[in-house]
Amino acid sequence: MELYDLTIHELRDLLRKEEVSPEEVLDSFYKRIDEVEDKVKAYVTLTRDEARNSLASLKDGRLAGIPLAIKDNISTRGIKTTCSSKILNNYKPPYDATVVKRLKEEGGITLGKTNMDEFAMGSSTENSGFYPTHNPWNLDHAPGGSSGGSAAAVAAGEAPGALGSDTGGSIRQPAAFCGVVGLKPTYGCVSRYGLVAFASSLDQIGPITKDVTDSALLLNVISGHDPMDSTSVDREKEDYTTYLKDDVKGMKIGLPEEYFSLDFNSEVKDKVMSAVKELEKAGAIVEEVSLPNIEYALAAYYIIAPAEASSNLARYDGVRYGYRSENGDSVRSMFTNTRSEGFGDEVKRRIMLGTYVLSSGYYDAFYLKAQKVRTLIKEDFERVFKDYDVLISPTTPTTAFKLGEMTDPLEMYQSDVFTVPVNIAGIPAISVPCGFDSNNLPIGLQIMGPHFGEGKILQTAYTLEQALNMKTKRPKL
């Protein structure tokens, strides 16, 4: 087996025993990138020189010598951070995001920045301002989004792990499509300092990895209070690896009836239910539960997220950094032309929608109502988690669709139906592979937990991973 096929914890063990050197590990991944990147297109920037230079001053931490990929909306000092948008082309931040700083402090090495839907707006990575990323399991299919580059890089062996961001499913959905593990932590568990904002009350950074153990390892490093982020929660640090036990005996698992009653792909439903049966065999108690307000989650999300985006994206004007239009005979026309030329269609669509729902006369009818619905959804989850340890659903209603197939924006928005409620409520959730459809495309299962219930979802995910033996499955490129 090649080094690029190994997990983070397997590489770490080899490095600690000095059976391989950090140089050999790094070379293995760049060699793999050279072999398959033209097909996958997971990266927008590769940082070979920076990575090799960092070997000379490598810190002896928990990730010493481990190369990682970073989504292109997470700030990296002196390295292009474009959000896959023309408007931020050539922008190099003067600082590292807190998560990047923490990875470096533990000896992590940045391989490069991964492709994404522009400003994290999309579910296919087709909205990238550069090029679409391809699913390593079938290159004609989408890897999901918006963290499609991160998920594809991990699945293709172009990185042992990656960071993504999740606003409405952007870590979990591509993880499901690419057959890897994607963890969206509790809102406030991981610092957002240095994350380019899409919807500030929904965004959260998390890991995408080959197995559940690696997700726990990366969460150990990136989680924790950060005074630079006012939404970061100051609580005692946990060691998430202590939850990696193959044991769900007596655990109460809820299946939300509002999810399972929806009309979605039968192969996805069958594989998820068969995985749930494995947990029952392992001693878990599985019961149906109700989240009555969940049906309004998608509508509320597509009001709140664009509203926050229209405010956050107002800062891109061509004056201080990024793209500036050469057309225009006044400051006002320069602003207008810069934004018209610099933003892609999906970003413009969401800015316009957000501006509309925040405008006078419509604020109460849309934005205020959506926030009230958000409270009801949070209360639904809080009520259910009084009696249940975790909830389980499919991660996505379908497996990966073909690139160019999903042309209707509303249809694309519907694909977030299982993931969005988690962000609305601010709770943690993980997507783990649970099988394949008849076309050999991966299927993901989502495990949701209460606020700061990462331990419970990791324990459930780990047990499932052991039962299904999915972590050894890799695409052939």
UniProtKB/Swiss-Prot annotation:
Swiss-Prot/TrEMBL keywords: ATP-binding, Ligase, Nucleotide-binding, Protein biosynthesis
Species in which this protein is naturally found: Halothermothrix orenii (strain H 168 / OCM 544 / DSM 9562)
UniProt cross-references to InterPro entries, sorted A to Z: Amidase, Amidase_CS, Amidase_dom, AS_sf, GatA
Similarity remark: Belongs to the amidase family. GatA subfamily.
Any one GO molecular-function label of the UniProt entry: glutaminyl-tRNA synthase (glutamine-hydrolyzing) activity
Assembly information from the UniProt record: Heterotrimer of A, B and C subunits.
Gene3D superfamilies named among the record's database cross-references: Amidase signature (AS) domain
One example of a Gene Ontology biological process annotation: translation
Protein's UniProt name: Glutamyl-tRNA(Gln) amidotransferase subunit A
